[in-house]
């Protein structure tokens, strides 16, 4: 039945687009004739094609990185606008979720842009991990990896993490549906955005300062992080990836909005946050292997500082006391 539904949806979309000059009415009719999930799938397929084709034309697979902070809130706005135009009313919980995801996207887009991630659109920086992986594969294997994982799976994941917003759209829409839990979760979401922003800024300031010094000046620096080459102060002395901790928690909060809407702790959209956590685990492991190859003292940092979850103060104190006694 699902396959028939999507075949019908594809036929309707083709009917809307086959005219040389379709009107805005044609587009809106096509949009509302499909359910919001189907509309989002069309966006997903377009982004996969865009990322794969442009990665070949530009010899740069970081097109997914460029839309990473943008496409999730596009999906959320698709869900919100579809509900609004179909029902002629505002879904307030969905609007709240959409605005929060948009806030996340604007912040992350700015952070990516200031690091030169967008360049001049055609020529832009490629994530340092991709060239390393590219050297490990022959061309056919790399192209297959590009299509299935970089352009395919990562875009699928961006779609999946936004799907709790679709679950929210199926729940109560009225202003009176917003309750205490929505307010608490909204504040937690905002706190996580601030946490991630501060952590990113700390690391950005460190990198800017480090690369403003000559290699000789770095070795003579009074700052341990500068001498050893990697940041290990402020938030980064509590865990090795505080920004990633906040990032994953942000999407857990998005999922919890769907739980509030359904009144149940579990729904099928949980697959997005689960797969996101798994992706981050692999990404962190690969990134740290590169860092370790450049900075041997990073192994000591790994041994003493947790990867994601900071140790509580009492655990840290107990560990320090134990270390002092052993010495």
Regions found by a protein language model. Give the residues of each.
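A broad structural signal for alpha-helix termini and local helix breaks/kinks
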Residues: 57-58, 137, 295, 305
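Hydrophobic transmembrane alpha-helices
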Residues: 2-48, 71-112, 155-202, 207, ...
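N-terminal, membrane-interfacial amphipathic/helix-forming hydrophobic leader that caps
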Residues: 45, 52-60, 66
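Broad structural signal for hydrophobic residues in well-ordered alpha-helices, predominantly aliphatic
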Residues: 53-54, 133, 291, 301
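Residue-level signal for the start and early helices of compact helical domains
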Residues: 55, 121-124, 144, 194, ...
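Voltage-sensing domain
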Residues: 144-154, 159-160
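Intramembrane alpha-helical segments
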Residues: 48-54, 142, 167
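Juxtamembrane helix-capping/reentrant segments at transmembrane boundaries
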Residues: 60-74, 116, 120-148, 229-236
């Amino acid at each position: 039945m699902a396959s028939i539904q999507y075949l019908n949806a594809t036929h309707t979309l083709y009917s809307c687009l086959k005219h040389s000059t379709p009107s805005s009415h044609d587009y809106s009719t096509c949009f509302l004739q499909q359910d919001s999930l189907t509309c989002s799938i069309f966006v997903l397929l377009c982004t996969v094609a865009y990322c794969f084709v442009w990665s070949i034309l530009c010899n740069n697979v970081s097109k997914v990185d460029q839309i990473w902070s943008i496409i999730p809130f596009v999906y959320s706005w698709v869900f919100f606008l579809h509900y609004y135009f179909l029902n002629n009313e505002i879904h307030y919980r969905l609007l709240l979720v959409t605005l929060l995801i948009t806030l996340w996207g604007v912040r992350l887009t700015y952070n990516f842009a200031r690091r030169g991630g967008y360049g001049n659109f055609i020529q832009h920086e490629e994530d340092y991990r991709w060239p390393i992986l590219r050297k490990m594969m022959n061309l056919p294997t790399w192209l297959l990896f590009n299509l299935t994982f970089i352009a395919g799976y990562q875009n699928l994941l961006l779609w999946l993490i936004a799907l709790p917003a679709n679950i929210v759209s199926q729940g109560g829409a009225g202003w009176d549906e917003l309750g205490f839990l929505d307010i608490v979760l909204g504040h937690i979401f905002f706190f996580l955005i601030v946490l991630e922003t501060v952590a990113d800024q700390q690391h950005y300031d460190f990198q800017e300062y480090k690369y403003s010094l000559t290699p000789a000046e770095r070795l003579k620096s009074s700052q341990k992080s500068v001498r050893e080459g990697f940041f290990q102060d402020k938030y980064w002395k509590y865990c090795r990836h505080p920004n990633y901790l906040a990032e994953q928690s942000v999407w857990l909060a998005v999922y919890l909005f769907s739980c509030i809407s359904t009144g149940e702790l579990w729904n099928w959209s949980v697959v997005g946050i689960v797969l996101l956590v798994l992706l981050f685990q692999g990404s962190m492991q690969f990134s740290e292997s590169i860092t370790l190859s450049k900075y041997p003292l990073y192994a000591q940092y790994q041994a003493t500082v947790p990867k994601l979850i900071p140790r509580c103060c009492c655990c840290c104190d107990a560990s320090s006391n134990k270390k002092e006694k052993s010495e």
